[in-house]
Amino acid sequence: METFSSKDMALKAQKKILSKMATKSMVQMIIDDTSSEILDELYRVSKEYTGNRSEAQKVVKDLIKVVVKIGVLFRHNRFNEEELKLAQNFQKKLRQGAMTAISFHEVDFTFDKTVMSDILTESRDMLLKLVNTHLTTKSHGRINHVFNHYADPELLTQLYNSSGPLKPHLNKICNGLNKLLENGTL
């Protein structure tokens, strides 16, 4: 028997359309200014670290696509009880990561690349488990791409180097994360 569902088709179409529209101008219409500023700084960090503009754009675009698709899944109540619990744990892990990033930034000589990398890796694994049955292999690849990029211990070391060229970006990222934590967004 054929199992056609217009609701499923609409969801797939919406995810596809939104992922195609993951441009900077479109993102600014969907997300708040603080999140947009953080994404801009993450792009700059990636660009300076890799020396490759297109790779930096791809990482941030992958991040945006994943966030949009997960938002669509939430909006359409696609997660079961177990997945919703996992989503809450993922959100807690992100919050922990943000607070850790800020703490490492604010308190000199406390940065530990292993701790930060582990938090990002654990977050990636939780997210992959959450979307396992909902997103395509290509989207799973995007999640891996984003988290593996930002969990790179060498990138993190350069980012937290107090006299390094990435320090101004870290300042802005942490200021943005602080705002998101204070207003309850994160």
UniProtKB/Swiss-Prot annotation:
Assigned GO CC terms:
cytoplasm
Source species, please? Danio rerio
Q: Signal peptide span per the entry?
A: none
So what family is this one in?
Belongs to the TNFAIP8 family. TNFAIP8L2 subfamily.
Q: Which PANTHER family match?
A: TUMOR NECROSIS FACTOR ALPHA-INDUCED PROTEIN 8-LIKE PROTEIN 2 (PTHR12757:SF4), TUMOR NECROSIS FACTOR INDUCED PROTEIN (PTHR12757)
Ordered alphabetically, the record's keywords are: Immunity, Innate immunity
- Protein name in UniProt: Tumor necrosis factor, alpha-induced protein 8-like protein 2 B
Task: Cite the domain annotation text.
Answer: The central region was initially thought to constitute a DED (death effector) domain. However, 3D-structure data reveal a previously uncharacterized fold that is different from the predicted fold of a DED (death effector) domain. It consists of a large, hydrophobic central cavity that is poised for cofactor binding.
Function, please? Acts as a negative regulator of innate and adaptive immunity by maintaining immune homeostasis. Negative regulator of Toll-like receptor and T-cell receptor function. Prevents hyperresponsiveness of the immune system and maintains immune homeostasis. Inhibits jun/ap1 and NF-kappa-B activation. Promotes Fas-induced apoptosis.
Q: Specify whether Zinc-finger is a keyword of the entry.
A: no
Q: Which InterPro entries match?
A: TNFAIP8-like, TNFAIP8_sf
A GO BP term here is: regulation of apoptotic process
Q: Which domain of life is it from?
A: Eukaryota
